[in-house]
């Protein structure tokens, strides 16, 4: 009797089968397209950002090839290429989710910002593979739904039914989608049963170490929004240098973020929330207060970074739909809600660069 295959072999076989099913599904088998299951993409919760991972990164933002990530937005003119010889896009990437995890925020933002290109940055290999497979499955499902809707619309177009077809177009599309799509389960949550704005063509994910290569991907003032959701708190003092919020990294975020752009943060650790506020100049700790009284170069440098951001008021946050998605759509946000924990939100607006003195 042949023993059952080991867990790793099961995971590899499942991933291969899922990828093939997504790429080879025909126009008539919408129900066969399913989202990947997380249990086959397990990985450790953390990755050391200071290790020398085998990462591919562009020489500069002008060398980055985005064409494979957003095929629906590739410039139709083949002569429009970047410095690396890759096809250009019709628009630039302008929304970034740093540490995108399993892609909950990307999926939630896709229909909310259908005209904006959104990218998730993740350092863990298996997690990135899950997000990529998930996005491909959602895109394939949307393509099948569009084809089914177009077929149903063409069949119903007669002179006597034209007005009724116009009035009931959306209802027919929803009914066709519901009939073709399976009911969501625990492993296939958020499976869309109707067409969504953008059809998930505006989201993608890349493997990258943000702490090392963030400026290699994004040019000055390119981004309109940056999301940092439930980052690793690194509780030990000797590990604070690995936190994704710091004076140095905040300066890089300010470089890529355009004036008026927003940097969103959310955490369930109150101490880390105050760390964020201190590093954006909203709060002052004991060390910062002593530095302010001194004339050390370090104090001046910290003040310079803090002058680039201002905190967004609570009144504005209540009207911002992205804040709601950040709280409710992310996997960590759902886990905190299940455990009835607290969520600490802070959003900062990029100020206009000060003018050079005359």
UniProtKB/Swiss-Prot annotation:
GO-annotated molecular function: tRNA (guanine(46)-N7)-methyltransferase activity; tRNA binding
GO cellular component: nucleus; tRNA methyltransferase complex
Reactions this protein catalyses: guanosine(46) in tRNA + S-adenosyl-L-methionine = N(7)-methylguanosine(46) in tRNA + S-adenosyl-L-homocysteine
Residues the record lists as binding S-adenosyl-L-methionine: 99, 122-123, 209-210, 229, 330-332
EC code: 2.1.1.33
Superkingdom as given in the UniProt entry: Eukaryota
Coiled-coil regions, chain positions: none
Function: Catalyzes the formation of N(7)-methylguanine at position 46 (m7G46) in tRNA.
Protein name: tRNA (guanine-N(7)-)-methyltransferase
Organism name: Aspergillus fumigatus (strain CBS 144.89 / FGSC A1163 / CEA10)
Organism placement in taxonomy: Eukaryota, Fungi, Dikarya, Ascomycota, Pezizomycotina
Gene name per UniProt: trm8
């Amino acid at each position: 009797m042949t023993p059952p295959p080991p867990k790793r072999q099961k995971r590899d076989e499942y991933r291969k089968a899922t990828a093939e099913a997504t790429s080879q599904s025909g126009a008539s088998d919408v129900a066969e397209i399913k989202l990947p299951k997380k249990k086959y993409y397990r990985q450790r919760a953390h990755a050391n950002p200071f290790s020398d991972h085998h990462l591919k990164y562009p020489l500069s933002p002008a060398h980055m090839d985005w064409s494979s990530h957003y095929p629906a937005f590739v410039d139709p003119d083949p002569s429009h290429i970047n410095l690396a010889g890759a096809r250009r896009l019709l628009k630039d990437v302008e929304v970034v989710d740093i540490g995108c995890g399993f892609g909950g925020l990307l999926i939630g933002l896709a229909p909310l910002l259908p005209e904006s290109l959104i990218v998730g940055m993740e350092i863990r290999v298996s997690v990135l593979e899950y997000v990529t497979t998930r996005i491909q499955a959602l895109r394939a499902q949307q393509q099948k739904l569009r084809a089914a809707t177009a077929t149903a619309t063409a069949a119903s177009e007669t002179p006597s039914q034209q007005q009724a077809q116009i009035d009931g177009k959306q209802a027919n599309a929803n009914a066709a989608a519901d009939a073709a799509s399976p009911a969501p389960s625990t492993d296939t949550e958020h499976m869309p049963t109707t067409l969504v704005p953008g059809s998930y063509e505006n989201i993608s994910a890349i493997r990258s170490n943000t702490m090392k290569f963030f400026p290699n991907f994004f040019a000055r003032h390119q981004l309109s929004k940056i999301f940092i959701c439930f980052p690793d708190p690194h509780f030990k003092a000797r590990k604070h240098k690995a936190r994704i919020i710091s004076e140095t990294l905040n300066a890089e975020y300010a470089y890529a973020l355009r004036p008026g752009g927003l940097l969103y943060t959310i955490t369930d650790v109150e101490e880390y929330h105050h760390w964020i506020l201190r590093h954006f100049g909203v709060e002052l700790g004991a060390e910062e207060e002593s530095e302010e009284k001194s004339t050390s170069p370090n104090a001046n440098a910290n003040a310079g970074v803090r002058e680039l951001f201002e905190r967004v008021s609570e009144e504005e946050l209540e009207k911002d739909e992205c804040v709601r998605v950040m709280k409710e759509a992310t996997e960590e946000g759902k886990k905190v809600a299940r455990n009835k924990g607290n969520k600490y939100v802070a959003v900062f607006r990029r100020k206009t660069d000060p003018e050079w003195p005359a």
